[in-house]
């Protein structure tokens, strides 16, 4: 009975053209799907640090509050220094960080104002928080202000929650404006900088990109699985925020800690970002990609981040399959990850790509797609 019910549901998903399946990325393909923007996951120094970290064992064997607190505080100290903030807390994943931080800090009687295009982990954290949630139009400062003014005085606390860099479009939140609004209305600004850390502001993220300094009303969230090339997530803020989360954040308290060898790799990754020009190399590659992609008319304006949405709508999955058949790994993104009518090939570039790689990608796409 249960099996048949699930089969019917899966068939509906297939009939609607929304069926997902797991695909193995073959060796030797040209990869435009990875979030490993700085290629640190394969950096020799990072790999060596991971090997050295195996002296602690293959796993952490418990949560941070039991047997799992091994070398994690060294990583937290490194991130806090890197992000120029008081303190950092490391979680087992970026998803767990957003869910755990938002659901712990935001409570019944509070109001969350969340950007329309925020990541699913933010949306889930808002749902778990028991706070009221209002969605403001994407990066629309005027709409956000109007919502706050309409609800002023009705709630105990106000939280503005936004991605720093939006994962599907690669655009940047207007943090300078959001910070002004947070200051004016005594709100807390929570920034998920998963795609900004290691990319913008000399690698220190979106806040640094706008020359903004950490403050008491800013909570920064990040991931260790994208530009850092490892696994896990983190939250940065004032001392009291971290102390509170250690005691109340369920996804921190009840999750097994990151494996210690992964922690060592992440520490080394931050050191590489600090001591080399690897972030500048990424920014140089973004400028090269901008020229190529504009030449082929896949973008109209220059990007500041390594995420490029090529909107192909109903042709998206056909193009994605064509690319894979030609040894280019670049996945199609469709509803419900993105709105209907905005299906796209999400192109992620990294420091390892060459101009010729961008040209090849565009040529292969042109074989099945014409903008005319």
Curated annotation (Swiss-Prot):
Substrate binds at residues 20, 119, 337. The modification N6-(pyridoxal phosphate)lysine is found at residue 226. Pathway: Cofactor biosynthesis; biotin biosynthesis. Signal peptide: none annotated. PROSITE patterns: AA_TRANSFER_CLASS_2. CDD domains: KBL_like. Keywords: Biotin biosynthesis, Pyridoxal phosphate, Transferase. It is an enzyme of class 2 (transferase). Pfam families: Aminotran_1_2. Its EC number is 2.3.1.47. Gene3D superfamilies: Aspartate Aminotransferase, domain 1 (3.90.1150.10), Type I PLP-dependent aspartate aminotransferase-like (Major domain) (3.40.640.10). Its cofactor is pyridoxal 5'-phosphate. GO terms for molecular function: 8-amino-7-oxononanoate synthase activity; pyridoxal phosphate binding. It catalyses: 6-carboxyhexanoyl-[ACP] + L-alanine + H(+) = (8S)-8-amino-7-oxononanoate + holo-[ACP] + CO2. One of its GO terms (biological process) is biotin biosynthetic process. Pyridoxal 5'-phosphate binds at residues 94-95, 167, 192-195, 223-226. InterPro entries: Aminotrans_II_pyridoxalP_BS (IPR001917), Aminotransferase_I/II_large (IPR004839), AON_synthase_class-II (IPR050087), AONS_Archaea/Proteobacteria (IPR004723), PyrdxlP-dep_Trfase (IPR015424), PyrdxlP-dep_Trfase_major (IPR015421), PyrdxlP-dep_Trfase_small (IPR015422). NCBIfam families: bioF. Catalyzes the decarboxylative condensation of pimeloyl-[acyl-carrier protein] and L-alanine to produce 8-amino-7-oxononanoate (AON), [acyl-carrier protein], and carbon dioxide. Homodimer. Belongs to the class-II pyridoxal-phosphate-dependent aminotransferase family. BioF subfamily. This is Putative 8-amino-7-oxononanoate synthase.
């Amino acid at each position: 009975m249960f099996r048949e019910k699930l089969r019917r549901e899966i068939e509906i998903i297939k009939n609607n053209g929304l069926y997902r399946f797991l695909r193995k990325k073959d060796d030797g393909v040209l990869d435009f799907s990875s979030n490993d923007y700085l290629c640190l996951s394969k950096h020799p120094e990072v790999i060596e640090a991971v090997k050295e970290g195996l002296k602690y064992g293959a796993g952490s064997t418990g949560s941070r509050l039991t047997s799992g607190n091994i070398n994690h505080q060294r990583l937290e100290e490194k991130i806090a220094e890197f992000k120029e903030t008081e303190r950092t807390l490391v979680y087992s994943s970026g998803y767990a960080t957003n869910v755990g931080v938002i659901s712990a800090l935001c409570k019944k009687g509070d109001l969350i104002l969340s950007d329309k295009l925020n990541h699913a982990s933010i949306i889930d954290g808002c749902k778990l928080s028991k706070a009221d949630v209002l969605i403001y139009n994407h990066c629309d400062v005027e709409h956000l202000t109007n919502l706050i003014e309409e609800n002023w005085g009705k709630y105990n606390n106000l939280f503005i929650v936004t991605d720093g860099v939006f994962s599907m479009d690669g655009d940047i939140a207007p943090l300078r404006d959001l910070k002004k609004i947070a200051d004016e209305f005594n709100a807390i600004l929570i920034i998920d900088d998963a795609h900004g850390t290691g990319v913008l502001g000399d690698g220190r993220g979106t806040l640094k990109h706008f020359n903004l300094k950490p403050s008491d009303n800013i909570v920064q969230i990040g991931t260790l699985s994208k530009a850092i090339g490892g696994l896990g997530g983190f939250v940065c803020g004032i001392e009291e925020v971290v102390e509170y989360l250690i005691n109340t954040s369920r996804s921190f308290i009840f999750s097994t800690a990151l494996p210690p060898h992964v922690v060592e790799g992440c520490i080394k990754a931050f050191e590489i970002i600090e001591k080399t020009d690897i972030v500048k190399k990424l920014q140089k590659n973004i400028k090269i990609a901008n020229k190529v992609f504009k030449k082929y008319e896949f973008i109209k304006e220059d990007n500041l981040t390594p995420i490029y949405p090529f909107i192909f709508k109903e042709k998206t999955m056909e193009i994605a399959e064509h690319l894979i058949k030609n040894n280019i790994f670049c996945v199609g993104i469709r509803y419900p990850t993105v709105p209907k009518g905005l299906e796209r090939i999400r192109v992620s570039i990294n420091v390892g790509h060459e101009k010729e790689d961008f040209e090849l990608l565009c040529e292969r796409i042109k074989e099945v797609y014409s903008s005319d």
